[in-house]
Design a protein with these regions (language model features):
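Boundary regions of SH3-family modules and the immediately adjacent low-complexity/disordered segments
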Residues: 35-62, 108-168
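Aromatic-lined carbohydrate-binding/catalytic grooves of carbohydrate-active enzymes
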Residues: 201-235, 321-329, 488
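Aromatic-lined carbohydrate-recognition surfaces of secreted/lumenal glycan-active proteins
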Residues: 253-263, 313-316, 320, 340-380, ...
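Substrate-binding cleft of secreted/luminal carbohydrate-active enzymes
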Residues: 391-407, 413-418, 423, 427-500
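Active-site-adjacent "subsite" loops/lids of carbohydrate-active enzymes
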Residues: 169-182, 186, 242-245, 255-302
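Catalytic domains of carbohydrate-active enzymes, especially glycoside hydrolases
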Residues: 191-216, 306-311, 393, 467-475
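SH3/SH3-like (including bacterial SH3b) beta-barrel domains
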Residues: 2-13, 71-84
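SH3/SH3-like beta-barrel superfamily modules
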Residues: 10-44, 83-119
Length: 500
């Protein structure tokens, strides 16, 4: 008998249906009657299982993008790391996504076991070893290098340029046109004075320190993972939370800033995670250190839960400024357990951090040096395209007095920022999923070592205008390390301007 089957609809893996004993056969294939949404259908009998765990049949996968291996499927604890191009065995999974794909696979590889995100895995070795080259993306980056010498920051050719899905949280929209103030941890007791300026002048985002050397409040994560840092807490937790609540109640987007690898307190508690070098006596946790990764991500997650931030901003996501000298000295130990290049470590950390923070319903932004607008991987491991492609917002720091002392670049902020922004805008176009470009601007009298130019509202406006003139329209954050109330009073009218 010919049943004249025709396809009606497809169901994703993991869909729950009611099956009946009735089966029919066509073209040597058995079909079982099912009910779904009060309608009867026939499906290939081989596609039905009684236990949802049996719906995942794959036994082998291949690593397309180097992956962090987690101890379990629930938290941020790191078990190991597996590089691109490796075959791994699938031994289980956590949950199925709405589209039927697996969220995390339970895997094994030699003596490594744990969980990895399925989005970084593919079905064949050919796919795993390929580089993303749609619109010649990989070709754009693969041969880039600093002219004249090797910086030892890594090769652009070893970095990942596959599109990274950027979430949009319905109850927490990403700030895409920021007019942002920066507040250090010492300002918490004066929050009302800053909010008065903010509310009256169109400030729509505020960056507040969580950790910059000292902690802004008494973190339980730090108490466990870095007691030395815990002892530095500057504010009462309730006072700090009250300040963040006031920011959000004012309709202002709250960004929590964490200085990541430049952390002497964590370094004192964990010297095993720090770079050791005769070329430097700095106590600097290595960007290769998974212990430092986990500490900062757990600190960020705690801040989201306890304080209610909309976004976490990571600063100092890099190796030290003197990483070049450390590298060429030949007597430095960067604690490079997994044989990564510096830029690979930075990018791999950001994959890890973004995955963890997106689970919490918040965004990740990262600060980078102004130098990163160039067409090369820096000595300290930052490469704009490899970072912007992953994070939700990228905040470069092209301060006008940071372009050398031979020319007074600070006296004409529009020209200086305009020249810089051309490179940054070009970098944004070289990747499939660029971040929002939200730029730090100079909001202090310059140059910093001997101020001679007053940076008033017009100087702020000049910088912002240059950004928008070059298509960097994600907004700005004013950098004033002391968070001077007097300076904010002086420049407040610049926030009220329309730059779009």
């Amino acid at each position: 008998e010919n049943n004249n089957f025709k396809e009606d609809k497809k169901q994703t893996r993991g869909t729950k249906v009611t099956s009946f004993d009735k089966t029919i056969e066509e073209n040597n294939t058995k079909y079982t009657q099912i009910e779904y949404n009060n309608t009867n259908y026939y499906v290939n009998s081989r596609n039905l299982v009684s236990d949802i765990k049996d719906s995942v049949l794959e036994k082998t996968k291949y690593v397309r993008t180097s992956v962090t291996v987690y101890e379990n499927e629930k938290d941020s604890k790191i078990s190991s790391f597996i590089k691109k191009g490796n075959e791994i065995s699938i031994t289980g999974y956590d949950i199925l996504n709405e589209d039927g794909t697996v969220n995390m696979y339970k895997i094994s590889k030699d003596d490594i076991t744990g969980y990895v995100y399925s989005k970084y895995l593919v079905d064949t070795m050919e796919e795993a070893t390929a580089n993303y080259n749609e619109n010649s993306v990989y070709d754009t980056h693969k041969d880039r290098k600093y002219p004249g010498r090797e910086l030892h920051g890594g090769k652009a050719s070893t970095l990942d340029y596959y599109p990274y899905e950027k979430p949009q949280f319905k109850d927490n929209p990403l700030m895409k046109n920021a007019k942002a103030m920066y507040l250090n941890a010492a300002t918490i007791s004066s929050i009302d004075s800053y909010l008065k300026i903010a509310k009256e002048n169109g400030v729509n985002a505020i960056v507040v320190d969580i950790k910059d050397g000292a902690l802004a409040y008494s973190s339980e994560v730090a108490k466990e993972m870095s007691p030395t840092a815990y002892a530095t807490a500057m504010n009462d937790n309730s006072a700090y939370k009250s300040a963040i609540d006031k920011i959000k109640e004012s309709g202002i987007y709250a960004i929590g800033r964490i200085v990541v690898f430049n952390d002497v307190h964590y370094g004192k508690d964990h010297p095993e995670d720090c770079i050791s070098s005769k070329a430097s006596n700095r106590l600097w946790p290595s960007a290769y250190s998974r212990g430092a990764w986990q500490y900062n991500v757990e600190l960020a997650k705690e801040a989201v839960h306890e304080m209610g931030f909309n976004e976490i901003q990571f600063d100092y996501v890099r190796f030290p400024e003197d990483a070049y000298n450390m590298s060429v000295s030949g007597n430095s130990d960067f604690k490079n357990k997994y044989d990564e290049e510096k830029a690979e470590a930075v990018q791999n950390f950001l994959f890890y951090a973004a995955d963890q923070l997106h689970k919490e319903g918040v965004y990740l932004s990262v600060d980078v040096f102004g130098e990163c607008s160039g067409e090369y991987v820096t000595a300290y491991g930052q490469y704009w395209p490899a970072i912007s492609n992953i994070v939700d917002a990228i905040s470069s720091m092209p301060y006008t007095d940071h372009f050398g002392r031979s020319v007074d670049t600070w006296s004409n902020p529009y020209q200086t920022m305009n020249n810089w922004a051309k490179g940054a805008a070009a970098r944004q176009k070289e990747i499939p999923t660029p971040a929002v470009a939200r730029t730090w601007i100079t909001a202090y009298d310059t140059p910093y070592w001997k101020p001679t130019v007053i940076y008033n509202a017009s100087k702020i406006e000049d910088q912002v205008r240059a950004l928008y003139d070059n298509g960097l329209d994600g907004g700005f954050i004013t950098w004033n390390s002391s968070s001077s109330l007097a300076k904010y009073e002086q420049i407040k009218s610049a926030f009220a301007k329309n730059y779009e």
